[in-house]
Amino acid sequence: MSKPIVMERGVKYRDADKMALIPVKNVVTEREALLRKPEWMKIKLPADSTRIQGIKAAMRKNGLHSVCEEASCPNLAECFNHGTATFMILGAICTRRCPFCDVAHGRPVAPDANEPVKLAQTIADMALRYVVITSVDRDDLRDGGAQHFADCITAIREKSPSIKIETLVPDFRGRMDRALDILTATPPDVFNHNLENVPRIYRQVRPGADYNWSLKLLERFKEAHPEIPTKSGLMVGLGETNEEIIEVMRDLRRHGVTMLTLGQYLQPSRHHLPVQRYVSPDEFEEMKAEALAMGFTHAACGPFVRSSYHADLQAKGIEVK
């Protein structure tokens, strides 16, 4: 019998080490079993990386993190080259260990009390007009990190009064009342929480999370602030059917959500959940039409769409694929 991994505080556990801690075991994907990417999934990198390196340098200088880097987002080059980034607060170590996600798992260190000020100054220096703030899950904190979100929102607005702020929050599992008391007192301009996938495979895809809990979080925030758009994102290609995705979309509408993102899941490493299928651009267009017919005011659906991909354009209703 193998000994359990003893996690050291502040150490990042990735790939095989991270997956070893998941109750629902994932079989490592052999190279020959990997699905070949279709032509529409090929990414063209920008010829000039000056802007990309500049944003990375600004992050490093202030000890900040972007989910773009930590989660190995395929759109990193495009977004950084356009001067946009999704900031990840509360460190780069997540207390959850979802097998689709490339963010490191482990025992995180205490939150940086100076992070809100450093974040606000960096955003002001970059002259951003729209910013997305997300975080790792922090099940070790009594409020799940909600107060830190609020402190960041306050600090950003002090430095950049006209900025629009979107928060992409974790589920605050077991801490919803406390978290919502804080977040509804200092609300963002868009409140985002991702369902990620369909209930049938939730235990496999999001161990430690609960589908109905996430729906309730979105609903309760909307009840407190009906004037603020709520948003959620889904990945496809993990073994769900299009019909199941459409039913999740109906659930989101029943819980007051008006903004939707839908994108292709990509396997970060062979230790993560494998891609079961690549969804064609035509299928994404069909699901977008379904979403708009249901009453979503915004629906960004396409192979490379991610929750915060061109979030400023999404919020304006400009088509994003």
Swiss-Prot record:
Annotated residues for binding of [4Fe-4S] cluster 2: C94, C98, C101
Any single Gene Ontology cellular-component annotation: cytoplasm
One Pfam assignment: LIAS_N
Enzyme Commission no: 2.8.1.8
Co-factor: note: Binds 2 [4Fe-4S] clusters per subunit. One cluster is coordinated with 3 cysteines and an exchangeable S-adenosyl-L-methionine.
Domain of life: Bacteria
Name of the top EC class for this enzyme: transferase
Main subcellular location of this protein, as a coarse class: cytoplasm
Family matches, as SMART domains: Elp3
Record key words, sorted: 4Fe-4S, Cytoplasm, Iron, Iron-sulfur, Metal-binding, S-adenosyl-L-methionine, Transferase
Domain (Radical SAM core): residue spans on this chain: 80-297
Metabolic or biological pathway, per its Swiss-Prot or TrEMBL entry: Protein modification; protein lipoylation via endogenous pathway; protein N(6)-(lipoyl)lysine from octanoyl-[acyl-carrier-protein]: step 2/2
Recorded GO MF terms: 4 iron, 4 sulfur cluster binding; lipoate synthase activity; metal ion binding
Localization per Swiss-Prot or TrEMBL: Cytoplasm
Reactions it catalyzes: [[Fe-S] cluster scaffold protein carrying a second [4Fe-4S](2+) cluster] + N(6)-octanoyl-L-lysyl-[protein] + 2 oxidized [2Fe-2S]-[ferredoxin] + 2 S-adenosyl-L-methionine + 4 H(+) = [[Fe-S] cluster scaffold protein] + N(6)-[(R)-dihydrolipoyl]-L-lysyl-[protein] + 4 Fe(3+) + 2 hydrogen sulfide + 2 5'-deoxyadenosine + 2 L-methionine + 2 reduced [2Fe-2S]-[ferredoxin]
Cofactors (names): [4Fe-4S] cluster
Coiled coil: none
Binding site for [4Fe-4S] cluster 1: C68, C73, C79, S308
Family of this protein: Belongs to the radical SAM superfamily. Lipoyl synthase family.
Protein name: Lipoyl synthase
Biological source species: Escherichia fergusonii (strain ATCC 35469 / DSM 13698 / CCUG 18766 / IAM 14443 / JCM 21226 / LMG 7866 / NBRC 102419 / NCTC 12128 / CDC 0568-73)
Name of the gene this protein is made from: lipA
